[in-house]
Amino acid sequence: MAGSAVPPALLRDLAAVLGGNHVLTGDATAGYVTDWTSRYRGTTPAVLRPERTEQVAAVLALLSGAGIPVVPQGGNTGLVGGGVPLHGEVVLSLARLTGLGPVDQDSGQVTAGAGVTLAAAAAADPGLDVGVLIASRDSATVGGAVATNAGGLRVLRYGPMRAQLRGVQAVLSDGTVIEHLGGLVKDNTGYDYPSLLAGSEGTLAVVTAARLQLVPRPRDPVTVLVAAGDGLEEVHGLARSAVRTVPGLLSAEFLTQPGLDVLIAHAGLVPPLPAPAPAYLILEAAGRGALDDLAGLIGDRPVAVAEAAADRARLWAYRERMPEAAGFLGPP
């Protein structure tokens, strides 16, 4: 359904719900109509910025009644245009839903508003972490991660966002609020709303809060970047072996030399190893014996090893900054 102008009377009704400062039009919408890479750009008649679930419900009821399409938007860190109003939709920004409850020490769970960043949720308890770790964690939001079923760098260990969910609160297009934040691990009382909404990209409902199962923060992680002289086939074999033989494996991510060349040329990174290779594998493991386990797997292949946090961050930059390569290459 193509977007259309929002009638002035409806804009006034929306402003009555949200406050005039949180109904943006004209030039004030510029930051909401393009994705992080600038490869996708749209237009919108208005950006709505609710702060509470009841406001989300009220504005969706108004827009649904007027037949006006909506695109929900979280931190706008996506790379494929999913949160961009490509057809002139109204943008519903969830960035102001930033409530973050205390961590339940018995269950290790926390309830976070859709606008809470993944980094903020991960910092809720010094001994616990969010299982989904992505490069944009300082800007990416809980609601967006649920809507996209984000995977991240530790998906091998902890699964995607769906696996972290113990409950959701969401609003249907007509303004009906779904409350399912109880946090029971085994709950057969009805539809599994967390699983249904994870990955639904805003097509079923707008997620306004999520109850997350936190995971123990990894102890003594070790990161290695290994050169694969035989390319992706060797990377695949190494990754499969790592899953079988490294008990503390947290991550296995690959990158290729062409992508690395773009980063070296445009982002100021230096080559990770003295000689180039067709492909590379980054592995991270934690716990007792992690370094020995990784060493046994790698053998005599060229490798960079990092144990200190700053050194590990430098190695991960080669993977985490890889989406920048798409931006450097310009529109498709």
Question: How would you label these PLM feature ranges?
Answer:
Residues 1-61, 65, 78-108, 257-270, ...:
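N-terminal flexible segment immediately upstream of the FAD-binding catalytic core
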Residues 71-72, 132:
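Short hydrophobic alpha-helical runs that function as membrane-insertion/retention elements
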Residues 80-83, 90-94, 141, 203-211, ...:
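Short, acidic (Asp/Glu-rich) active-site segment that either coordinates a divalent metal cofactor
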Residues 99-106, 110-253:
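FAD-binding subdomain of flavoenzyme oxidoreductases
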Residues 73-77:
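Glycine-rich beta-strand-to-loop/alpha-helix junction loops that act as flexible
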Residues 9-21, 58-66, 124, 237-248, ...:
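Generic non-transmembrane alpha-helical segments
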Residues 1-5, 28-34, 42, 48-54, ...:
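Feature of Fe-S/electron-transfer and energy-metabolism proteins
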Residues 26-33, 216, 225-229, 234-332:
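C-terminal substrate-recognition/cap domain of FAD-linked oxidoreductases
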